[in-house]
């Protein structure tokens, strides 16, 4: 397990534990369960991703700790509409406030303006956050292996499936992949190409880890996909699912940036 102490990720996780305590005081788990039951029906995230080639999870992100403000003119509803028209399979919506200037309500805003399923992109540390994701109308959650113990991964993925949520498990290296593979095969696997300590990006990380997976297992490459050549390189290694945010968010028209990178995805 990567030691995340003294990294940005470590600071984020510490803040998330503080945030969890505050949220529990504001609304107990039982109340959140009731909100989750009343949420709009799930849209199948994994299913949508598997039926587009390439399958693109297009991210709605205003800022990041490393880049600061990425998109000053930030309208989640408009961005969601543009992504759907461009051919995205799914959305990824940042809800972290402190480091990414996201907001819980952005999931519902984005979903209300398109038919795409949405991932709650956040740093979840407890099953409470998972139930909360469903209450916020998310269709999928992100579990970052570097932030969580094996027990937490098991418990939180189980909670997600009990609430009809899909699960994207994110890894950075071989050791984390080995841990992720202990979880249900229902989980989607994502490889983040960004080194947590240096923040350098190496697309070969996905290619290297892909070789350790059964051919049938869908793999999503995350971070650093910026040019059509990057996309082609992944496709040549039988990687057809992508999570892309910054490359779209920093352009005036995210839909045009999407088309420049991926062309027109086909339904399969």
Swiss-Prot record:
Q: What is this protein called?
A: Indole-3-glycerol phosphate synthase
- The top EC class is lyase
Question: What Gene3D superfamilies does the annotation carry?
Answer: Aldolase class I
Please give the family membership noted in the entry. Belongs to the TrpC family.
Q: Entry's Pfam families? A: IGPS
List the HAMAP family hit by this protein, alphabetically.
Answer: IGPS_B
What's a GO biological-process term for it?
Answer: L-tryptophan biosynthetic process
Among its keywords, does the record have Nuclease?
A: no
Q: Which UniProt keywords are given for this protein, alphabetically ordered?
A: Amino-acid biosynthesis, Aromatic amino acid biosynthesis, Decarboxylase, Lyase, Tryptophan biosynthesis
Enzyme Commission no:
4.1.1.48
- State the pathway, as annotated in the record: Amino-acid biosynthesis; L-tryptophan biosynthesis; L-tryptophan from chorismate: step 4/5
Any idea which GO molecular function terms this record carries?
indole-3-glycerol-phosphate synthase activity; phosphoribosylanthranilate isomerase activity
Q: Which InterPro entries does its entry note?
A: Aldolase_TIM (IPR013785), Indole-3-glycerol_P_synth (IPR045186), Indole-3-glycerol_P_synth_dom (IPR013798), Indole-3-GlycerolPSynthase_CS (IPR001468), RibuloseP-bd_barrel (IPR011060)
Reactions it catalyzes: 1-(2-carboxyphenylamino)-1-deoxy-D-ribulose 5-phosphate + H(+) = (1S,2R)-1-C-(indol-3-yl)glycerol 3-phosphate + CO2 + H2O
Protein species of origin: Acinetobacter baumannii (strain SDF)
